[in-house]
Amino acid sequence: MLSIILTGHGGFASGMEKAMKQILGEQSQFIAIDFPETSSTALLTSQLEEAIAQLDCEDGIVFLTDLLGGTPFRVASTLAMQKPGCEVITGTNLQLLLEMVLEREWLSGEEFRVQALECGHRGLTSLVDELGRCHEECPVEEGI
C-alpha cells in the first residue's frame, strides 16, 4: 500500500486529516504535517524526513500538498526527487484525499498520480454544472 504524507500551510493538513477521519475513520500509512506561520523550511524538511522514516515506504510514498510553488510543495518535491518511488500531488482537496486514500492499496505511484489528477478535476465543479449534468443524465428521483 502506498504511504501518504499530507502537508500544507497553516492547519491545512491537520484540518483535512480531521475531516478524513470523520468520514473514513483512522487510516494506516498516513501522516499529516502542518506548516504554520511560525515554522521554517528547515523544520518542515526535518518533519517530512522523519515522516518518511516512520512510514513503510516499500510500495512508495505520495506527498499531497496544498499549493503549487508553496514551501510544503517545494520541500516535498526536493525530497521526492531524492527518493525513488515518490510522487508529489498539489492542489489537494477533500474529495481527492478521500477517494485516493481508499484507492491507494491497489495503485502504483504513477497510477495514483494519474487517478488523483482526474479525481481533483472531477471534484471541482459548480451547482449549475451539476444541475445541468444531472438534468441530462439523471432520472428525476435521483438528485445531484
Description of each model-found segment:
Residues M1-I144:
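N-terminal loops that bind phosphate or other acidic moieties
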